[in-house]
Amino acid sequence: MKRFAAVVVYDGSNFFGYQIQPNKRTVQGVFEEALERIHKAKIPTDGAGRTDTGVHAYGQVIAFTSNLDRLTPKHMKDALNANLPDDIYVRRIHEVPSNFSPRFAAKKRIYHYYILNTKEPDLFRRKYFWWFPYEVDLNRMRQASRYLIGEHDFTSFRTGHDDRSTIRTITGIRILRLQKNIILIRVEGISFLRRMVRNIVGLLMRVGTGGIEPKKTKEILEARDRSKLPSSAPAHGLVLHKVIFDEFET
């Protein structure tokens, strides 16, 4: 038996998120269908991040155990890509220890959020950028982001309810203008709550337009109340860019 970790890129536009759901097209479901065709048996998988509907990935990591000992990582990569649809692609595969779990072994997760800051929309980019036609001040956004760095209770930035702790650690936020009209917000952390990154982006963009003062970020964080936060940024601008492990380079 071999355990593999696949580094996967996907266009999330036509998926109902990562996690398997009944009668829905999901990344995990489609990936497991490809594995079943290769193995002639159901093969369970374990992902590093549960991206929401419409969210993309460049560095999702999906682990699984195979009884096809003859297959090298390269052979497995080729077999998977031959059986996957054209909106998912395996970039590389690593052989990992039998107890490896990408969800729990991850040391850091890096998300990128892309914003098209133009007066007119670009229809060819509409699935991958949040079109934001208003002027924004990136320095104000950077000031606000500093309040979010470190370990905090991010209840105000959570959508929905679950049993997980709301204490999370953000290790870095970078706000860059890649080109004249493209803004990148890069958020790094150990793990995130549901829609946490999109909620952070929504707040930062409101700060950038002058709708909220940067120092108000601290009050919103400490309020532990989702209703204090502006609307979440849309899903289609978000990319799970990279997951970092000790075991291998992604």
From Swiss-Prot:
Coiled coil: none annotated. Its EC number is 5.4.99.12. Substrate binds at Y111. Signal peptide: none annotated. It comes from the Bacteria. NCBIfam families: hisT_truA (TIGR00071). Formation of pseudouridine at positions 38, 39 and 40 in the anticodon stem and loop of transfer RNAs. This is tRNA pseudouridine synthase A. It comes from Kosmotoga olearia (strain ATCC BAA-1733 / DSM 21960 / TBF 19.5.1). The gene is truA.
